[in-house]
């Protein structure tokens, strides 16, 4: 099993099914014997490979879609009110129900944004460390302290880890930017006019 960035995650050791026999998730034995559970919606299946999409990525797509839809619905509701196509009482009732859903999604999105920023920080630290090791190996090679074969060994050890981290960082950055675009800087709804 690999993630969408190409990193090996381990081997599948168990499959979870619901009462109807549908796939619910899999258990993966990761490095060090750690058992990790992946939900079915995270899995991409091909004849030769199972690919795992990070949960944050799926959640971000869902939340972005839901927040965008809720904003459109609130805007449409206000438009109906402004053109007097609905009564004030119905407007207030519908607006209150939309606001509750919107506020809940905003809170969920803010929590997801915070966890994505934390992951981005972790990845940034790992990329920085690996890049430093790679630069030091190249520096040692240029100064004659490290032979060509040792440099290739160092590069062969570092680069397969570095490239997926860079891909994940770029993916996280893009998803975070899109998520923050749909998050309001502050939440306001125009006062009720009847």
Task: Annotate the PLM regions.
Residues 1-187, 191-193:
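Peripheral interaction segments used for macromolecular assembly
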């Amino acid at each position: 099993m690999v993630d969408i960035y190409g990193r090996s995650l381990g081997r599948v050791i168990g499959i979870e099914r619901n009462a109807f026999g549908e796939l619910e998730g899999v258990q993966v034995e990761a490095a060090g014997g750690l058992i990790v559970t992946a939900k079915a919606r995270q899995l991409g299946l091909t004849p030769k490979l199972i690919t795992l999409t990070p949960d944050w990525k799926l959640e971000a797509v869902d939340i972005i879609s839901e927040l965008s839809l809720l904003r459109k619905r609130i805007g449409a509701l206000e438009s109906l009110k402004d053109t007097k196509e609905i009564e004030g009482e119905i407007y207030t009732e519908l607006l209150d129900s939309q606001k509750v859903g919107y506020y809940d999604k905003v809170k969920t999105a803010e929590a997801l944004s915070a966890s994505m920023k934390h992951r981005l920080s972790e990845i940034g630290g790992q990329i920085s460390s690996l890049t430093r090791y790679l630069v030091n190996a190249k520096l040692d090679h240029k100064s004659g302290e490290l032979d060509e074969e040792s440099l290739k060994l160092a590069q062969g050890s570092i680069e397969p880890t570095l490239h997926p981290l860079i891909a994940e960082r770029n993916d996280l950055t893009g998803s975070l930017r899109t998520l923050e675009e749909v998050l309001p800087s502050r939440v306001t709804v125009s006062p009720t006019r009847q």
